């Protein structure tokens, strides 16, 4: 039995002597009970002598003694004692031989197929030989006759002999000599694999022969129960049946050996015993598993511990609890934000023991079962007693699926006679609940600590701000928003002069809530406003310090609630929210807003538009036409929808719903009024025949059936993405659960360098900087403006902008160097409280929930978006904010005939300097700049001015154009330019010839060639272009699949080519491939081969740097971290994930993504082992590699070299320091086996492992006990000392 207080859990391999020391007796009989007297069989699987604490009076079958103590046996008495089975012939453990990386195979250096043949007596192994020709380990066919001077063995006994004869230390020395002499990479890999496994056994002290079993432990009966259903029927655990088969076969083998049966019969019986032991440990893995009479596979040890219904996940990580219930939810607008109504029947059941205690004290009832009868007779008394008791309790409500912490909140209890839970309408957004049959679970906290937590931490009014992005989550929605919008809408009626707020409210009530009145209100200045706007402004700003004379929409109300929260006005927010709720429901009821068929305006001349589309459809790209029509119709809809054509009202109901943000989107209205657009098939491919009809006028038969494809796809996607996003959340939780705030400051000296001028909008800058801390102090004119570790809030941010500070260094969780978890200063503010994060906050769990929760809103399909120009090339109007001199750096430019500088290299740097660098920008190919090197420019000057978003290819030299008119180009009409161009169908080559100089240009597919053959052109002239609307639609996997690809650090299917050296490019065309050669200035070169179907972003003669993207596709994360830097990886990773969420209007704060990336980048790979104890190719934690190098440096030895790697979240979770956490995630058997071989110890530092063993988690309120324990010795030091002592080798 496990002691209640323990600090760590260890796992080791068990030898036969260890199993014997656990055992309380040998099990010899296969029978469970004696069916005559229904007593357990002596020496059987339920023998009381072995498994019970009680001593029996006698062992007779027909025992009727009065002192028969096992008749009153309790479950606890058969709970913890272990027995054993002594095998008559050794058997191999299936987990050590049939796993993906067979341990026995690695140690003996024999393949799995050979081992299987040895076990099944098809081959025999030479154990000892006196013949020079035949050596040890030689294999022979079993039936072959061999001389007497050679000793051979077969079966599990042979493997046991081979494993016990291994001298691990000598094997290591031999293999090290082989490594030095090895020339082949494949041989080196196999030797390293072999030496790794041997070293693990050598350092751990485990003997390889223990993998072959002589004794098997028998679990206590409580873990494999036998339940009586009736007098002669019993339900037994599958483990009992498997034990029974093992015992029967073992007994049969023993009998056959004693009677000296023929050799072949003995062999067959040994094989059957081996198979039964395989089945006991892992029945599902066998080709012919043991089945029941109904042909069901019996559940073995493996199935008991692994999977969703195994011990780890069903019984340890998640448990069913008492004092809980569930029922349907309905809305109750008259509640306060912190209240909910519970049905009396549920409350009576939950509080039954408490009521029983009170009634028993008064001597009214004697047993708990009488409460129901007493309630029927004395309803009023029980309800009064219940109401008194309910006052001191707060109930916890939970709605599944619990994707984030806002799904679990506590409320004050009110009782109702209805049979549903009634909740406040404003908490629906937190729970993502509606009232179409949703159910909620009720939980009653009982202990004092649980009550305190539910009364304060979980209370709904303390969860107004979302921890994922810092935005308000308890906000007015739907009907309330619509009512407030209508209340503050300007109907442009005649205005009345009123100055006092009380007069305005009285006037509103006196006129039967007529709010369509304009008022001339005197607030410092006379304002012509509406009655509704004055009342809403009075709620937010009582003294009218500010006055917002606008229509109040959802976004504005959200910003105002966040504004009040920033200034610590929580009590004011709650009052305002309650008043907004009442006003919203009142006005939406009085207004009677609803939509009808006549609210859907008609777009005129649609017939002519469709006619034009029909003609153009066969000459142009269909995607471009739909995009043009989309923009065209949206403008018409916005203009026409605002005013109802009947003229009865001044507002359109549909427009109110859309503009207020209460319901609907422009996409839905476009489908109702204009056209439906593209639909996808069931496999995700887009049907290239868009629907130009709308839902108002109806669809024809063809379009109706095309619509059904999309509807089916939508339904299947919903079910798939729910499962996938749930799995993604689980993976994120598993990788980040041990990230908790344990320190105030880690004293790191590394962080992120941020160029304030590189952000084109203030919103972007605010989102990235707000809530971070400065790494170094900020100076201006040799005076410290801001000290280090200053929190960047609104004031600091505006000070930086005002003082024109260009570069700052900020702290990031990615560079936090805390021994355990993360420090407060690196994390910054807690977004849900708007204050510096407190010690004990489980930031890892919050990050995982923040990324995983909006996952269900993402799309599963492959969507079509802009390709080359929109993804890799940036263009925008840029205005300089400082006066200074122009300087170009690291770029190749040409000057066109208009005197404009055009960048023709992959990218270039542009700087404004005046003694020091004031501003720095990065421009990409094709950027036109008005100024040259050394020019003086003033602030607020427009630097670049793009009139269009097209992508152009420019000439770099003067000369004649030459190209062959082959099948690769076709003449095509361009709708945008109203001209005919040659369009490229494949990659195409254009040459510009000037005397002896030739320059080749490779034009990608789908570009329009602007020049003609034999044209004479100058530098900077356009050769070819890709119009923004007709950009090749590249299929980019969007939504969840792309998110999963990034977090798993998979190599993309279409991988971008990255330059590994600095140098000049030379491109050749060979067969169907490009041969790209990058020649360095030092003479060496690097050659790449790329398919001609891919797009190149470079031309002949371009100078590229390490890490430059040379072709289309997505870069590999491991290449980014090794070729460029971890800082670039951070910015790329954050931008990629935000680009997935942004189209769905979801914002996830950068720090959450950084925390996950921290976990993904904490490993290194050893490139050169030097004289350290590491092996080449080992994957270690970064801290372990640094510690190892320190110890080698102390001993004056050669250091090891390593490189940072990015590991996927699944792999990171499985390679966790805690084997408990890893085993409960997935691949349970493999992790437990590898951990046992290494003698691993789990120090229970994370949250999951503490939940598994039933302790308080080391986070939040559970952290106080851990701090008390740490006063004597630091657990961090212990952890790292133990990790340093151990030899951590990653299995291949």
From Swiss-Prot:
It holds the Pfam family RNA_pol_Rpb1_1. It is an enzyme of class 2 (transferase). InterPro entries: DNA-dir_RpoC_beta_prime, DNA-dir_RpoC_beta_prime_bact, RNA_pol_asu, RNA_pol_N, RNA_pol_Rpb1_1, RNA_pol_Rpb1_3, RNA_pol_Rpb1_3_sf, RNA_pol_Rpb1_4. It comes from the Bacteria. Binds 1 Mg(2+) ion per subunit. Binds 1 Zn(2+) ion per subunit; 2 are expected compared to other organisms. PANTHER family: DNA-DIRECTED RNA POLYMERASE, DNA-DIRECTED RNA POLYMERASE SUBUNIT BETA. The RNAP catalytic core consists of 2 alpha, 1 beta, 1 beta' and 1 omega subunit. When a sigma factor is associated with the core the holoenzyme is formed, which can initiate transcription. This is DNA-directed RNA polymerase subunit beta'. It comes from Carsonella ruddii (strain PV).
């Amino acid at each position: 039995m496990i002691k209640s207080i323990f600090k760590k859990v260890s796992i080791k391999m068990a030898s036969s002597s260890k199993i014997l020391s656990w055992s309380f007796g040998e099990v010899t009989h296969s029978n469970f009970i004696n069916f005559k007297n229904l007593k357990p069989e002596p020496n059987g699987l339920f023998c009381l002598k072995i498994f019970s604490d009680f001593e029996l009076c006698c062992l007779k079958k027909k025992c009727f003694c009065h002192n028969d103590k096992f008749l009153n046996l309790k479950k606890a008495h058969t709970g913890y004692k272990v027995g054993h089975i002594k095998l008559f012939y050794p058997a191999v453990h299936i987990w050590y031989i049939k796993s993906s990386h067979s341990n026995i195979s690695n140690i003996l250096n024999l393949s799995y197929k050979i081992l299987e043949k040895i076990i099944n007596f098809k081959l025999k192994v030479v154990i000892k030989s006196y013949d020079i020709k035949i050596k040890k380990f030689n294999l022979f066919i079993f039936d072959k006759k061999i001389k007497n001077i050679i000793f051979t063995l077969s079966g599990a006994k042979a493997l046991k002999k081979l494993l016990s004869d291994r001298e691990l230390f000598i094997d290591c020395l031999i293999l090290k000599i082989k490594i030095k002499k090895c020339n082949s990479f494949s041989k080196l890999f196999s030797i390293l694999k072999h030496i790794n496994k041997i070293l693990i056994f050598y350092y751990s002290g485990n003997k390889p022969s223990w993998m072959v079993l002589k004794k098997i432990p028998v679990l206590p009966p409580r873990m494999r129960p036998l339940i009586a259903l009736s007098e002669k029927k019993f339900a037994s655990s599958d483990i009992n049946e498997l034990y029974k088969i093992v015992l029967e076969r073992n007994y049969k083998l023993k009998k056959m050996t004693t009677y000296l049966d023929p050799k072949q019969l003995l062999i067959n019986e040994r094989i059957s015993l081996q198979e039964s032991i395989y089945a006991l440990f892992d029945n599902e893995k066998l080709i012919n598993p043991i089945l029941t009479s109904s042909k069901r596979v019996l559940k073995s040890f493996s199935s008991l511990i692994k999977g969703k219904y195994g011990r780890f996940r069903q019984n340890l990580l998640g448990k069913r609890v008492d004092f809980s219930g569930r029922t349907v939810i309905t809305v109750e607008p008259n509640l306060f934000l912190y209240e909910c109504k519970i049905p009396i029947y549920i409350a009576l059941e939950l509080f039954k023991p408490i009521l029983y205690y009170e009634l028993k004290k008064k001597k009214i009832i004697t047993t708990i079962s009488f409460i129901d009868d007493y309630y029927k007779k004395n309803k009023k008394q029980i309800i009064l007693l219940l109401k008194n008791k309910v006052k001191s309790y707060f109930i916890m409500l939970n709605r599944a699926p619990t994707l984030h912490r806002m799904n679990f909140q506590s409320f004050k209890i009110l009782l109702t006679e209805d049979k549903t839970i009634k909740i406040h309408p404003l908490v629906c957004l937190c729970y993502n609940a509606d009232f179409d049959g949703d159910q909620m679970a009720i939980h009653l906290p009982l202990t004092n600590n649980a009550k305190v937590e539910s009364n304060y931490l979980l209370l709904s009014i303390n969860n107004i701000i979302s921890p994922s992005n810092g935005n308000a989550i308890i906000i007015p929605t739907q009907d309330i928003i619509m009512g407030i919008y209508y209340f503050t809408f300007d109907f442009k009626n005649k205005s009345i002069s009123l100055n006092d707020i009380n007069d305005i409210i009285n006037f509103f009530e006196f006129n039967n809530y007529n709010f369509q009145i304009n008022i001339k209100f005197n607030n410092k200045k006379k304002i012509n406003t509406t009655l509704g706007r004055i009342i809403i402004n009075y709620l937010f700003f009582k003294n009218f310090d500010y006055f917002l004379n606008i229509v109040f929409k959802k976004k504005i109300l959200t910003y105002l609630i966040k504004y009040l929260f920033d200034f610590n006005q929580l009590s004011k927010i709650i009052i305002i929210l309650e008043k907004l709720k009442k006003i919203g429901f009142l006005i939406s009821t009085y207004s009677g807003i609803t939509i009808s068929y006549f609210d859907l305006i008609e777009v005129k001349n649609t017939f002519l538009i469709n006619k034009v589309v029909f003609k153009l459809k066969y000459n142009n790209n269909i995607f471009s036409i739909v995009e043009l029509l989309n923009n065209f119709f949206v403008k018409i809809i916005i203009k026409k929808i605002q005013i109802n054509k009947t003229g009865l009202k001044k507002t359109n109901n549909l427009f109110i719903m859309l503009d207020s943000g209460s319901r609907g989107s422009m996409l839905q209205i476009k489908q109702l009024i204009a056209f439906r657009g593209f639909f996808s098939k069931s496999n995700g491919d887009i049907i290239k025949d868009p629907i130009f009809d709308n839902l108002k006028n109806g669809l024809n038969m063809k379009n109706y059936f095309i619509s059904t494809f999309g509807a089916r796809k939508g339904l299947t996607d919903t079910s798939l993405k729910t499962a996938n996003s749930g799995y993604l959340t689980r993976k994120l939780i598993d990788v980040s659960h041990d990230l908790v705030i344990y320190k105030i400051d880690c004293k790191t000296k590394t962080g992120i360098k941020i160029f304030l001028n590189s952000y084109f909008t203030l919103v972007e800058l605010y989102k990235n900087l707000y809530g971070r801390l400065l790494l170094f102090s900020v100076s201006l004119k040799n005076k410290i403006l801001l000290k280090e570790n200053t929190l960047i809030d609104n004031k600091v941010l505006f000070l930086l902008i005002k003082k024109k500070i260009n570069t700052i260094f900020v702290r990031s969780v990615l560079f936090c160097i805390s021994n355990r978890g993360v420090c407060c200063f690196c994390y910054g503010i807690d977004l849900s409280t708007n204050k510096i994060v407190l010690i004990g906050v489980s930031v890892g769990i919050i990050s995982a929930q923040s990324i995983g929760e909006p996952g269900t809103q993402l799309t599963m399909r492959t969507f079509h978006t802009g390709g080359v120009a929109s993804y890799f090339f940036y263009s925008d109007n840029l205005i300089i904010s400082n006066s200074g001199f122009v300087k170009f750096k690291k770029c190749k430019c040409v000057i066109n005939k208009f005197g404009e500088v055009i960048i023709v290299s992959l990218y270039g740097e542009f700087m404004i300097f005046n003694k020091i660098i004031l501003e720095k920008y990065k421009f990409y190919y094709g950027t036109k700049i008005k100024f040259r090197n050394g020019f003086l420019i003033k602030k607020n000057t427009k630097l670049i001015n793009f009139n269009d978003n097209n992508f152009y290819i420019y000439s770099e030299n003067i000369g004649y154009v030459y190209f062959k008119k082959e099948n690769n180009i076709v003449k095509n009409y361009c709708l945008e330019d109203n001209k005919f161009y040659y369009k490229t169908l494949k990659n195409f080559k254009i040459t510009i010839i000037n005397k002896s100089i030739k320059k080749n240009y490779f034009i990608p597919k789908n570009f329009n060639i602007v020049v003609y053959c034999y044209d004479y052109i100058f530098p900077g002239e356009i050769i070819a272009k890709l119009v923004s609307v007709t950009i090749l639609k590249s299929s980019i996997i969007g939504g969840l699949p792309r998110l999963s690809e990034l977090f798993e650090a998979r190599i993309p299917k279409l991988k971008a080519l990255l330059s590994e050296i600095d140098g000049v490019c030379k491109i050749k065309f060979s067969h169907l491939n490009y041969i790209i050669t990058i020649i360095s200035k030092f003479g060496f070169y690097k050659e790449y081969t790329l398919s001609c179907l891919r797009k190149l972003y470079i031309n002949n003669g371009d100078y590229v740097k390490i890490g430059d993207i040379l072709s289309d596709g997505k870069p590999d994360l491991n290449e980014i971290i090794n070729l460029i830097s971890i800082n670039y990886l951070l910015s790329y990773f954050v931008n990629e994930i935000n680009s997935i969420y942004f189209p769905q209007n979801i914002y996830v704060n950068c720090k959450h993504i950084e925390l996950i990336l921290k976990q993904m980048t904490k490993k290194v790979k050893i490139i050169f082992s030097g004289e350290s104890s590491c092996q080449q190719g080992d994957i270690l934690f970064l801290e372990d590699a640094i510690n190892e190098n320190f110890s080698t440096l102390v001993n004056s030895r050669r250091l090891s070299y390593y490189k940072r790697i990015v590991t996927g979240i699944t792999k990171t979770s499985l390679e966790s320091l805690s084997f408990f956490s890893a085993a409960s995630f997935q691949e349970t058997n493999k992790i437990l086996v590898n951990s046992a071989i290494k003698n691993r110890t789990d120090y229970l530092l994370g949250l999951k492992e503490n939940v598994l063993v039933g302790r308080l988690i080391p986070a939040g309120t559970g952290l106080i006990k851990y701090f008390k324990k740490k006063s004597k010795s630091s657990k961090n030091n212990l952890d790292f000392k133990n990790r340093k002592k151990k030899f951590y080798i990653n299995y291949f």
